[in-house]
């Protein structure tokens, strides 16, 4: 039986909160995260990089990284 790696839930919550704070519409960003997670799940169905990381968590991390990169570029 494989054991899931312990994700720092406070870090993921921080990322999700950062994502929500940058969004003008909480519903829209929630739908975007869900759509990205669904798309990534089907795109990488055969080629799974990290089978222990859920697609939703991966989508939150990726989207918050994109927001922080935009902030870095604009500064």
UniProtKB/Swiss-Prot annotation:
A GO molecular function held by the record: DNA binding
UniProt keyword annotations, A-Z: DNA-directed RNA polymerase, Nucleotidyltransferase, Transcription, Transferase
Top-rank taxon, per record: Bacteria
Catalytic activity: RNA(n) + a ribonucleoside 5'-triphosphate = RNA(n+1) + diphosphate
Cellular component terms (Gene Ontology): DNA-directed RNA polymerase complex
Family: Belongs to the RNA polymerase subunit omega family.
Free-text function comment from the UniProt entry: Promotes RNA polymerase assembly. Latches the N- and C-terminal regions of the beta' subunit thereby facilitating its interaction with the beta and alpha subunits.
Protein's UniProt name: DNA-directed RNA polymerase subunit omega
């Amino acid at each position: 039986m494989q054991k899931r790696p312990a994700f720092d839930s406070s870090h993921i919550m921080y990322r999700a909160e950062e994502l929500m704070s940058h969004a003008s519409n909480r519903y829209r960003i929630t739908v975007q995260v869900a759509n990205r997670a669904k798309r990534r799940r089907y795109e990488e169905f055969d080629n799974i990089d990290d089978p222990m990381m859920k697609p939703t968590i991966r989508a939150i991390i990726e989207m918050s990284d994109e927001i922080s990169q935009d902030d870095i570029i604009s500064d």
